[in-house]
Amino acid sequence: MNQGQGDGQAQGQGGPATVAPRVRMITVRALLVIAAALVALLLGARHGWAFVLGIALFVLGILISVILHEAGHFLTAKSFGMKATQFFVGFGPTLWSTVRGETEYGVKALPFGAFVRITGMTTLDEVDPADEPRSMRNKPAWQRAIVMVAGSFMHFALAFVLLLILAIGIGQANDNTTTIGSVSPCVPASLKAFDQGSCTHSQGAAPAKAAGIKPGDKIIAIDGKPVHNWVQLGTAIRAQPAGQPMAVTVERDGQELTLHAVPATVPGRNGSYLGIGDAVIFTRSNPIAAVAFAGSAFGQVLTGSAEAVAKLPAALPDLFARDRAKTPAANVSSMVGAADIAGQAVASSGGWRYTVSDLLLILISINIFLGAVNLLPLLPMDGGHLAVIFYERIRAWLARLRGKPDPGLVDLQKLIPVSVGVFALLIGLGVLLMAADIFNPVHLVQ
């Protein structure tokens, strides 16, 4: 590093040793900007700029979530005197970095996450003898456990705060209704037109409009089968074969009417299309009620996520089925699918409350899901390291009972095959979900 005054002056004047890295970094930044611009142009041309904005907001939200996750590890490690040498956002080539104290902070080229480097996090890490007393592996088990849990805690805390913001600032959406809030004037001619709500070059009047369905109507049955909420209604519509008339029983001004609609299809979209939107009423909560709502909603999302993941193996064939939306477990999405839904939410014409509510709910669900999955006792996730810590303590306790010395830390070298297997399984599942989200996406509206 220290190459003398002469070299320092030459490099300061733009010598080859300095110019080459700068040129490479400028090239990397330029390529990233060009790539991002091309992706935005392609998405904008196909789905509209509102859709692109939704994806951008989603990516920003996820990036903030991941940064907070790593900040949880970083702050708890520092509070216990552990040495943290790096805190970076992104992966790949470094775009910018600065050193503050003993830690290097920076941004890398690929914004797909973040990482913290804590000295001696595992027995596999090489540590300078001078830093060994401050290494994570030399700290008490309870401190190491707190550091490992801190990442998921940040996900849960962020989700809870977003739920409070949703309840107090936006309001709770009462979508447990079948009342019509809007009727589309047309059948969109393409998936792009569908996402934008555009009627340019349409395929004619929407089935709901042609049948005489009006905003304010409450749909109570489809083909004589009662529907009690919007989910049931959407499932019934999507299951109806396009072109086949169906009886829609509505309640209007206290009277029941039976109207007949012929569902249509939108090119590139799965399921039949009726052209209706629900009437959602948003009710704001006071702070006390908001806390109760946040706790209840948190538990519901956590339980729902666990059930969906448990049922996912059996639902894998339904990922590519035409009626994917009918199987809740098959609605589990990759980040690609979640970004697509965020884009749809912003591109929809349901109003700003609906848009913000949908975006917040997406981020809330993902943070709760990530926080829970990350605590599963499987390496290389945080829960796997936590399980190893518990195993070490149980093993040490049993050794004391037998009058033997503490066996010490677990040799993680022996667990590498397990980590590789779990990692490969997660990658495979992620690729499968991503393929389903690309070729058989989930849509928000009916």
What role is predicted for each listed range?
Residues 197-200, 205-231:
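Conserved PDZ fold ligand-binding element
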Residues 2-7, 12-14, 50-130, 370-400:
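Small-residue-rich helix-interface/hinge motifs
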Residues 33-81, 333-365, 437, 446:
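Long, highly hydrophobic alpha-helical transmembrane signal-anchor segments
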Residues 2-48, 52:
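Topogenic membrane-insertion module of multi-pass membrane proteins
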Residues 69, 107, 208, 216-219, ...:
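Terminal peptide-recognition signature
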Residues 67-68, 79, 112-190, 417-421:
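Internal alpha-helical transmembrane segments
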